[in-house]
Amino acid sequence: MSGGREIALLGGSFNPPHVAHLMAAWWALATQGVSEVWLLPTFRHPFGKDLAPFEDRLEMCRLAARALRGVHVCGAEAELAADPLVGKTARTLEHLAAKHPDQRFALIVGADILAETAKWYRWDRVQALARIIVVGRQGHPPVPGAPDLPAISSTEIRARLARGEDVRGLVPEKVLRYVEEKGLYRG
């Protein structure tokens, strides 16, 4: 990769996207010298978890991204749907580097995820293709210079939605409306 702008990728299942995702994106834009943050929903979860349909998660990311200037959505993993390595960060980064040769990439990961990189496919390749930006997570060792994100979990949000509980304040309002209109995560 050459000079160009640096784009930070915030990958995840976004099942659904929540305000801590937006906080991480804003923090990266404000403090890490990146020109943009791309929300990058996984097409298929690398560890086999069930997800809402990709198209719904992509649209929820678009709705969430509208809240912050400089945050966009990248559906690159859909382009790799037939690839047996879809969902593997190294493969996605290789794809993006080939598609955008004038861009530099960074990868935003939570401290909780950083502890699991031994399970990742070709973590060494991920580090070669992208600068790693670590955000703190409550309940994990502090990350120097990074705030701890609130302990908001998509899993807990889905459970609350399934029980008919209120999740306002945890999920962007437009995302919540979409979830309700589509009947996602009902019990």
UniProtKB/Swiss-Prot annotation:
GO biological process per UniProt: NAD biosynthetic process
Catalysed reaction equations from the record: nicotinate beta-D-ribonucleotide + ATP + H(+) = deamido-NAD(+) + diphosphate
Pathway: Cofactor biosynthesis; NAD(+) biosynthesis; deamido-NAD(+) from nicotinate D-ribonucleotide: step 1/1
Source domain of life: Bacteria
Entry's EC annotation: 2.7.7.18
GO molecular function: ATP binding; nicotinate-nucleotide adenylyltransferase activity
Record CDD domains: NMNAT
InterPro entries recorded: Cyt_trans-like, NadD/NMNAT, Rossmann-like_a/b/a_fold
Pfam assignment, any one: CTP_transf_like
UniProt keyword annotations, A-Z: ATP-binding, NAD, Nucleotide-binding, Nucleotidyltransferase, Pyridine nucleotide biosynthesis, Transferase
Function comment: Catalyzes the reversible adenylation of nicotinate mononucleotide (NaMN) to nicotinic acid adenine dinucleotide (NaAD).
Stated family: Belongs to the NadD family.
Name of the protein: Probable nicotinate-nucleotide adenylyltransferase
Gene field: nadD
